[in-house]
């Protein structure tokens, strides 16, 4: 992947706890049941193209890789999770020492992707794969949506110039930045 330089947006921030609480409770369950080292394989796919267009465009790899490279539970994260009362100390210690050992395969950025076909595969300890799920879904779902729309607009323009005005309608500054980056 190529490096990113951006002064507007800190794309290297730690998104480890930007997850559904469910992912944490499932991971804690895996640890409690002795599945910490059990290897799992998760495939990400989509069921249908929302606009009936037949295909989507793969996008989001760079953001996903940057986020995965930054995964680390801080003491502040651990203390917050402890305060919920939902997790035992064994799980919190696991998170404190968390290191990703997964293999991740994905369709190349910019390629057409189709319903019911894997676009990202994650293989590794089940507990680690589970902790990646929300990050994977939120990153690729948004980026593929925007890339697909941009692809369709550019194809319809048939070589005429196209201008991007997405920031004013984007769902937050991240969406505006990453949409414009496509």
Regions from the language model: what does each represent?
Residues 6-39, 48-50, 86, 92-101, ...:
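Buried, small/hydrophobic-residue-enriched core segments of structured protein domains
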Residues 69-71, 106-109, 113:
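An N-terminal, globular interaction/scaffold subdomain
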Residues 39-97:
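N-terminal, Lys/Arg-enriched amphipathic/low-complexity engagement segments
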């Amino acid at each position: 992947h190529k490096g990113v330089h951006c002064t507007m947006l800190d794309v290297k921030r730690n998104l480890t706890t930007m997850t559904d609480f469910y992912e944490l409770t499932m991971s804690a369950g895996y640890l409690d049941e002795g599945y910490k080292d059990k290897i799992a394989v998760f495939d990400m796919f989509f069921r249908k193209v929302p606009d009936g267009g037949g295909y989507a465009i793969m996008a989001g790899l760079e953001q996903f890789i940057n986020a995965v490279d930054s995964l680390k539970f801080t003491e502040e994260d651990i203390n917050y999770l402890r305060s919920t009362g939902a997790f035992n100390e064994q799980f919190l210690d696991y998170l404190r020492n968390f290191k990703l050992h997964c293999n991740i395969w994905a369709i190349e950025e910019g390629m057409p992707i189709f319903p019911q076909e894997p676009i990202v595969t994650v293989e590794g300890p089940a507990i680690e794969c589970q902790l990646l799920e929300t990050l994977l879904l939120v990153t690729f779902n948004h980026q593929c949506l925007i890339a697909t729309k941009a692809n369709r607009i550019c194809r319809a323009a048939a070589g005429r110039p196209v201008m991007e005005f997405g920031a004013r309608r984007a769902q937050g500054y991240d969406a505006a930045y990453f949409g414009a980056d496509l």
